[in-house]
């Protein structure tokens, strides 16, 4: 009999559901045929088909390959004329299964050649106001001639090779095609004028000081091999100045000749350090190798200032550096440099954290630069893999923020009196963390920056946020007076102004860097925030951190694509995140949710109006309706005051009987006893799918937060209904109480709605 009764109830409930749907169909217009527009559909159309080079799991495939380029270089710096001369031997190894007809070499300095087309692709018209240096550069000065002067391109036997230069790319013709597994050795001789990076901008160049001396930060200074891979073939897109680089790994042996009074460092190990350092400097360096708490000054400010007061040395000396398995090379040189260093323990190895800066950087740089480098190595190694190189250098260069293997340039300078604000201090620490962090992305996890800016900048910005928070915790004096490090990017609320902006000037993250509006927000802020939300709100730290580290370890010293990242994050976590990638990375949709209504219900044993309406519509006799638990809305025709505050089993005898018949006394004692039932309608004016985080505040002041996974939107992308049963009355409901989901309009996130303040009252305040 009990089974029959339950079966009838089930039939009745299904019938009622059908009845409700019929009513909805009458009210809603008929939907025409359409393609699958569900936001939870898989990314099969967007993703390429897995193959032997890149697997469906996101890992490198069984036949994954990458090319290799090894360099031997002799470089000479003419400090007086700020000119650079170079000669290199490149050994290029073809590990691909393809036969190569020619080689492509990158000539990035040609972006600064006199006939460069870079200025001609900007269409902004006349700017309403400009700095004097900018005005002079745009309208008064002749274009700076900073392009490569290619003197020779020779094979290993000294025979000239045919080559063709197209702006920033040079095609080199080989005597015969380069077969799979073979290598080709050739030489290039070149020189170029070094630019003033302070007045003329740029990632490389020199800063001129009032005393007549200069500090050089040198990169993109040599003809560099382009990448050839299974995705792009030759990545030979032109360098226009903003979108960065794609480079193969290799070994660098570089000899750099500079004035004898210069202090130099760069990518790789200094193999003749004993010849370059004084005995005092060498002793200080050896002391720094044993100092894990505080930096040790190797070249003091007094020593640097003394050299700066003297005429520059006419003698020259050659520094020798060697780097294995790096994708690029950068270096810095000046007679005005101060240097300090300390050791950092990472994965059982001692890594040197180094800072190099002119006296103008102090006291800020001696206080915080090397400590920021050390914290970066610890935080990034925890989130990805143990740092594999022997050092990481932070160089102070005015208005700079740029990265190369083991070395980077960073801004942040006190005023002439040595004073600085928190803004300058935190700006310096943040840029150091960011640029040192680039050792991991893209120097080791070697993505194609030219095509996908976000793959290094966005991932790096995310880990930067983690490292900044670690910095505040581990160096509390750095954030004195604050509760936490004031990260500019990472917190969800910080990206809201961008995502709520004019859609005409917002591009999807999955856009080529050169073609994006609001470059910083698009390639840095939004992907960094998306990953922070993914970690904290969608996946949880344990799942996210394992998957993120898996991606990093799979692709260290390799060339990943966006799909390799997306697939690995799902493969290592057992989470279907296609909805997240689509919304955050492939569209410009924004998140906007709101509470449209909240209705309070109580339990009754008496038939409610909804049942009566169905009985009438279906012509169902009363005798056929069993005892049911009815939900009565407060304020409705069915509502009676005596229903309030009572348990369901008190009001519905059939429910009490059911519980007695089907559960033991111990089981009944463990059951909840809700007295209040709430129907909460949540609407989604925004297009972006996100979890619903909802906080309930009860009459006694206690709170409860419930997170509904994003999948709650899978069948209705516009609105959903939540039910909440409680033993206590709810007095307040808030969506996204901690601002975790980048909701662009929080004015509709609270129930009861906050009273609007009149303009008159606002003026009174």
Can you describe what each PLM-predicted range is?
Residues 26-106:
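Early extracytoplasmic/domain-onset interaction patches
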Residues 24-34, 74, 83, 93, ...:
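A surface-exposed beta-strand-loop module
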Residues 20, 32-54, 69, 321, ...:
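Hydrophobic alpha-helical and helix-loop surface patches within well-folded domains
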Residues 104-158, 261-262, 697-707, 725, ...:
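Solvent-exposed beta-hairpin/edge-strand motifs
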Residues 265-266, 577-578, 593-720, 726-736:
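Beta-strand-rich binding/interaction modules
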Residues 88-90, 94, 107-109, 182-196, ...:
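Short, hydrophobic/aromatic-enriched beta-strand segments in well-ordered soluble domains
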Residues 115-130, 191-252, 273, 343, ...:
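Glycine/proline-rich low-complexity spacer/linker segments in large multi-domain proteins
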Residues 223-234, 240-433, 462, 474:
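Hydrophobic helix-coil surface modules that form long, contiguous segments used
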